[in-house]
Amino acid sequence: MIRQDAWNALGQPDHFVRYAVDGVWTPWEYVNPPMQLGVEYRTTERHNNKPVYKKAVNTGALSAGTSKSVAHGVQDIGLRLSALYGLNNDGDNLVGNPGITGILVDGSNITITTAAGFSTSNSWVVIAYTKTTD
């Protein structure tokens, strides 16, 4: 087995790895994904020997006392491991926030249920999942 490491030449902290096993290279995987909105990252993490993917999804402004569903755009999503964290422009973490009563990730959407409003700022959620194709 051969391991190949690469870093972003522009000074970003991006670190990628891949392996050659019996002359066949595995896909590039992120050690520290940069988490740009809407980009899916295959990571070096594993769950039941399957690669874990991460994606940051813009969920917009959140009104008080409502549920909002936003399509995450993930194809072939398998096990939804978690909504790792969610943030708004004020730096509030939405996971564990008393103003957020639930964040649910299903096969198509992220649904956020609120008790308090976050309508004056944008929000986004980072999800972690496996894929049925791996």
Question: Which residues make up each language-model segment?
Answer:
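Short, surface-exposed charged micro-motifs
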Residues: 15-17, 43, 102
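Generic recognition of flexible, low-complexity loop/linker segments
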Residues: 3-5, 40-42, 100, 113-114
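Trimeric beta-solenoid/beta-helix "fiber body" segments of extracellular/virion adhesins
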Residues: 1-33, 88-90
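Extracellular attachment/recognition segments
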Residues: 50-124, 130-134
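Glycine-rich, low-complexity segments
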Residues: 21-54, 76-78, 134
